[in-house]
């Protein structure tokens, strides 16, 4: 074998010498010269050392002179093709041919109108070989002015956007245009040349025209290669491309190709090429250019393209990397990724594919979305992006208005019931049958009616700009009556506490400490007061009391702290939202501590304890506390009774005596002629606050807690549209659909699943 190699080398040298002599001998025969040149090309291609030897014997210089001097186009084409193939196989031949004289000769052939298309194509081929991977060649092609000639050919070779490649002349022109495009690519990159990149930026308007008018793969592939190499690692070139509208054109082409990819496989492959080009445009300026991408919803387009089954791992890597650059420092694109179920796709790429590059790209995308995911988890339900913000705002306004109307109707019903109760009390006072030695309760009734008036009118809605400015209230001085009412209330509270069998173990620890569990609420004061003094009380209807209301309110600083009604007026007026009439006086907008404190600081453990420590509660929190206290009392009764149940006969008799004694004690303290206002206790609990309704204590005689059936809410047209759109984009991920769209409050994932299956079965089932 070793002896054969020198023998073959010697034979190759002999062949090249003979071929060079034949080339010189057939100077007058163009066809023979063409055949000799093709044979030289074949010998040099089989052996890389043949080009070096052919250069040493002067063969390269002879072929260069032949290409210059020959008048036959056929010989020139063969000579240029042979030079290009020898330079392509051997780098030493490439360096020896890389001279300014040869570049000038090639430029002359390209600018000569007598040169045919095939000769120009061979000249471009030689330029391509000399410039490729050769910084010296890139410099010469710029200094000689050859790059300007190539740019002009790029603009003018193909004049018609509608390519008819079946026509031979059009096909030859297309091959020349494609060679020019490839030569420009090696002029700007491999290695990267910033100066040549800036010169090629002048072609961006022409490139945009081609992309907009011709969507054929034969045009898009070379143009995308040229754009990608021209923009690579050059911020200034990227800015020029975006300012010329190139990024918008690429986005439009990508969207069109993705929509066509469902029908043709080639469109999906072509969309990946456009994706790489777009990624090269935004790599170094992702923060500045990703806003343009969000306008065309490129992230959702890339996610849809990623699901195409025909793509391999390298193509999917290019798509995921482009998604990473789109979502970097752009919250709109990050939100679009979350909305279109992009995170599960990234996690799937991490787990299912074993490609290391693909895993790194998916990790890059997840890292970009880490910040916005944390924001959404902290403020779930607050959507501040695009169209969803307007829709959610309209829905919240409608719900708030509906709640205000509901609260106003409830308060109107309560006013009517109190007026009816006031008329009955007036009749009872006139008959003179209800008398008692307890002090007058006139002030308490007026205070209750005063609160109801504030409920009906919604209080005053005007807010003072200066918070420290106190509002003047028209009043008279009922200090003595109010102190008596407070003492009365404390006596009733003590009496009830002594007769309550549930609290035998609760003892007063001091006069300064208030036991909030036994404090009566605003709505229960009238239930606990049994009789009215006929001498002290004046028979008035609710209308008369309301007329004198402006004169019965004292300055807020002078009202005793024991009055629980005036403290909640402003909270009720904020809930109802009705402006006060001129007869109602302006009051300060006080709220209880439960309303002021941040909700993040409260939880199910410290909420009850915190409200019990408040000196005042609003109607909202009073109802909550009453329902909770009533529920706890029932539990304590059950616990005490269960603890006292024994099988010993003597203890059983003792238990019966205690229960009998407690019942008698209740009868003694309850007046036989006392009469509660109708429906007052029910109205105290029946408020517009959903929390109080949900925590209402069970009916006596029923054991345990019973779940309430949910109120039926029919699906609106918007919800049905949300449901179908969510299934189309996310599949049967009901929980994701539930949190992605603004469904009504109380909707669950299982409700969406059942509704969707009913809608699929038919309209008759969907009505259910």
Curated annotation (Swiss-Prot):
Main localization category: nucleus
Tell me where the ARM repeats sit in this chain. 101-145, 341-384
The segment annotated Interaction with TERF1 runs over: 524-700
Question: Could you identify this protein by its name?
Answer: Telomere repeats-binding bouquet formation protein 1
Spell out the residue ranges making up region: Disordered: 422-441, 454-475
What sequence ranges are listed for the domain Myb-like? Answer: 707-760
Query: Which residues are annotated with the PTM Phosphothreonine?
Result: 648
Coiled-coil stretches, from where to where?
399-448
Instruction: State the organism named in the record.
Output: Mus musculus (Mouse)
Q: What happens when the gene is disrupted?
A: Mice develop normally, exhibit no overt phenotype, but are infertile (both males and females). Testis lack postmeiotic cells due to massive elimination of spermatocytes, while females show degeneration of the ovaries, lacking growing follicles and mature oocytes.
């Amino acid at each position: 074998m070793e002896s054969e190699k020198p023998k073959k080398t010697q034979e190759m040298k002999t062949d090249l010498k003979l071929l060079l002599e034949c080339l010189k001998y057939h100077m007058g025969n163009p066809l023979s010269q063409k055949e000799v040149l093709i044979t030289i090309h074949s010998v040099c291609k089989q052996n890389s050392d043949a080009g070096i030897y052919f250069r040493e014997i002067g063969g390269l210089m002879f072929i260069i002179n032949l290409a210059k001097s020959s008048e036959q186009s056929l010989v020139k084409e063969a000579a240029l093709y042979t030079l290009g193939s020898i330079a392509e196989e051997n780098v030493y031949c490439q360096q020896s041919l890389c001279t300014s004289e040869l570049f000038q000769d090639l430029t002359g052939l390209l600018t000569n109108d007598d040169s045919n298309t095939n000769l120009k194509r061979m000249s471009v081929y030689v330029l391509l070989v000399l410039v490729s991977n050769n910084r010296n060649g890139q410099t010469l092609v710029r200094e000689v002015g050859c790059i300007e000639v190539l740019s002009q050919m790029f603009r003018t070779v193909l004049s018609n956007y509608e390519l008819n490649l079946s026509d031979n002349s059009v096909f030859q022109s297309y091959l020349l245009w494609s060679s020019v495009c490839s030569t420009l690519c090696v002029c700007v990159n491999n290695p990267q040349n910033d100066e040549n990149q800036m010169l090629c930026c002048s072609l961006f308007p022409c490139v945009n025209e081609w992309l907009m008018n011709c969507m054929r793969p034969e045009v898009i592939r070379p143009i995308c290669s040229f754009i990608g190499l021209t923009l690579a690692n050059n911020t200034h070139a990227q800015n020029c491309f975006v300012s010329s509208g190139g990024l918008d054109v690429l986005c439009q082409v990508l969207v069109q190709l993705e929509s066509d990819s469902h029908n043709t496989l080639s469109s999906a492959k072509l969309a990946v090429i456009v994706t790489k080009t777009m990624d090269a445009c935004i790599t170094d300026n992702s923060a500045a250019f990703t806003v343009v991408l969000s306008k065309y919803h490129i992230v959702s387009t890339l996610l849809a393209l990623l699901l195409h089954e025909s793509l391999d791992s390298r193509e999917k890597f290019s798509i995921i990397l482009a998604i990473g650059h789109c979502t970097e420092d752009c919250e709109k694109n990050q939100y679009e990724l979350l909305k279109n179920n992009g995170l599960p796709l990234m996690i799937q790429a991490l787990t299912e594919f074993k490609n290391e590059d693909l895993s790194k790209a998916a990790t890059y995308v997840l890292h970009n979305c880490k910040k916005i995911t944390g924001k959404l988890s902290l403020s779930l339900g607050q959507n501040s992006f695009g169209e969803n913000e307007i829709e959610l705002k309209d829905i919240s306004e409608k719900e708030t208005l509906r709640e205000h109307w509901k609260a106003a109707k409830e308060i109107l019903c309560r006013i009517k019931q109190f007026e009816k109760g006031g008329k009955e009390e007036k009749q009872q006072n006139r008959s003179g049958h209800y008398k008692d030695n307890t002090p007058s309760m006139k002030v308490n009734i007026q205070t209750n009616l005063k609160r109801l008036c504030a409920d009906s009118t919604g209080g005053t809605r005007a807010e003072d700009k200066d918070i420290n400015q106190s509002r003047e209230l028209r009043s008279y001085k009922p200090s003595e009556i109010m102190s008596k009412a407070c003492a009365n209330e404390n006596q009733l509270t003590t009496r009830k506490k002594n007769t309550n069998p549930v609290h035998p173990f609760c003892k007063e620890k001091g006069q300064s400490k208030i036991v909030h569990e036994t404090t009566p609420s605003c709505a229960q004061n009238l239930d606990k007061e049994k009789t009215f003094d006929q001498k002290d009380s004046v028979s008035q209807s609710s209308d008369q009391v309301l007329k004198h209301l402006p004169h019965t309110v004292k300055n807020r600083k002078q009202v005793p702290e024991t009055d629980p009604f005036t403290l909640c007026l402003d909270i009720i007026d904020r809930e109802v939202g009705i402006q006060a009439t001129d007869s109602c006086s302006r009051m300060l907008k006080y709220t209880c501590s439960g309303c002021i404190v941040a909700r993040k600081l409260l939880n199910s453990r410290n909420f009850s304890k915190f409200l019990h420590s408040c000196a005042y509660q609003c109607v909202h929190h009073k109802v909550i506390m009453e329902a909770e206290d009533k529920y706890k009392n029932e539990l304590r009764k059950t616990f005490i009774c269960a603890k006292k149940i024994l099988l010993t006969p003597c203890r059983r008799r003792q238990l019966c005596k205690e229960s009998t004694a407690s019942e008698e004690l209740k009868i003694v303290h309850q007046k036989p002629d006392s009469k509660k206002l109708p429906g007052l206790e029910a109205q105290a609990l029946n408020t517009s606050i959903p929390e109080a309704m949900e925590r209402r204590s069970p009916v006596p005689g029923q054991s345990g807690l019973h779940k309430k059936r949910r109120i039926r809410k029919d699906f609106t047209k918007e919800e049905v549209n949300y449901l179908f759109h969510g299934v189309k984009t996310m599949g049967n991920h009901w929980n994701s659909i539930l949190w992605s769209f603004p469904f009504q409050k109380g909707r669950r994932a299982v409700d969406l699943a059942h509704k969707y299956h009913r809608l699929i079965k038919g309209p008759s089932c969907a009505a259910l």
